Amino acid sequence: IGPSGAGKSTLAACLSGAVPHHFTGTFFGSVMVDGHDTCEVSLTDVSQIVGSVLQDIDTQMVASVVEDEMLFGLENFGVPHDQIEQRVSETLETVGISDLRDREIATLSGGQKQKVAIAAILAMRPRVLVLDEPTAALDPASSTLVFETLREANRTLGITIVVVEQKVALLSEYCNRVLVLNHGKIALQGEPHEVFAHTDELRAIGVDCPRVTRIFNSLEADGLASGTPCLDVDEAGRLITGIVDPAHTASDTQAPAGSPHAPSPRPHAKDAEPVLTFDHVEFAYPNGGAAVHDLSLTLYPGELVGIVGQNGAGKTTLTKLLTGLLKPASGSVRVTGLDTAAVPTSRIAREVATLFQNPDRQICKDTVLDEVAFGLELAGIDRAEALRRAQLVIDRFGLPADEAPFSLSRGQRQMVALASVVVVEPKIVVLDEPTSGLDYRECMTVMETVRTMAERGCAVIMVCHDMEVVSDFAERIVVMADGRILDRGRTHELFSNIELMQRAYVEPPQVIELSRRLASSVSPAFAQVSEVTDIVRITKEMVRRG
């Protein structure tokens, strides 16, 4: 783990032999993999020892159909034909994508592609598997499945697993050892309990800790906890249960004064006409994949709404219908009163701006200034005025106006893409995994900017698999599964509905799950809590009251 630009992907490239065989530069020292010096053997030889799953999955895919993607590596490595079928079937089943075997890769969601890439590499049985942010496009349940699969491969096949990842809660649960990189050097290393005890040091360099670890560290600072930091909800629940005086039990009916509740939608949000309306929308792709059924949804100015659900639930299809890229088979989608089926997509684009999961897919100019001004020029704004407005936004974001966007870090490129959205002042913004690939500090910068846009009246709809981010920033969520909306409502209330979360294969944020358990087993004082500081405050208050 580490902030953007820390050297994580470069380290992964060293392990796979891409450095120095593909990426050239000044190289000192040695990298030994399974007894081989990567500088002294060919990249072909290294690839038979080390399997790699890249951060940008589309650059890794070589076939058009899932089965062919699985076969490609096995056939190239000369695996006997009588073993290939068994390996393909077993690996697809292990990763949970047997149903995708005959699907065209172009029709898969980002998360489904990620699973295919992992399965294709696992099928080749490498000695070492290096994964660069393998769960960036995956929902929480699928992310857990990937890590369960990796742990099983480690235990049963003896494969050494090296993962570059931002989801610290998963790392803390599944990894034996954690290395923290900063400025190309190892800043911290050790077992998860040891590393995540350094909360302040980690956050100073742009790395988050599991929320329950933050709770432990805060209670430890107040003399209420000691020993090994908590890494999961079970450990945190036992800790707080042991701290709180036995007098405070589930029979308590009064929460301490000032107990927080999930934030209400902004008062102005529903005073205006809706900017987006889905009315009983139906859609299915020609190949029969990824249909949505009976979608009804309303979005008001100033709202920040999260769309959650597992991969393949229909979230991406919903956003494509919203932007006019897809037209409903029945029902209607209205954007600022415009029927998307009756007007060109270019007209809808004047009202809706999209921030892609991968910013490189929407950057097309040679300088940051030209990139940010581009949308204004497309809207007919005079170039001089477009450049003036773009410069104001660039200055606010602290970006280098004259630099080439692709010379910047992944996080900075995301900020360039966001600046391009902000400058056109859209009525609706669609965010597709806005924090994917960002470190903690960059994530907070992006989301605070998005929240400011909402406060100024922009309606924001956010597809996001990071439930912590959704909990922190979304006022409402829409829960989807199998192309349908299961429910919609206040964020905390729906995340606390364990039956709903199970139906949608969504894992609620750590703090909300912890508060739900504590409200049931310790005291209702913990109900409706969604912040680390609130859990700590209520615990301290209950201890003080004795």
Tell where the protein language model's regions lie, with residue ranges.
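Conserved ABC ATPase "signature" C-loop
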Residues: 184, 482-483
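The feature captures the beta-strand-to-loop junction immediately N-terminal to the Walker
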Residues: 1-3, 308-310
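Catalytic Walker B motif of ABC-type/P-loop ATPase nucleotide-binding domains
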Residues: 129-132, 429-432
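Conserved ABC ATPase signature
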Residues: 104-108, 112, 404-408
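Conserved ABC ATPase "signature" region
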Residues: 82-100, 384-401
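Helix-to-loop junction immediately C-terminal to a conserved catalytic motif
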Residues: 16, 323
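Conserved ABC transporter NBD signature motif
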Residues: 25-36, 331-339, 348
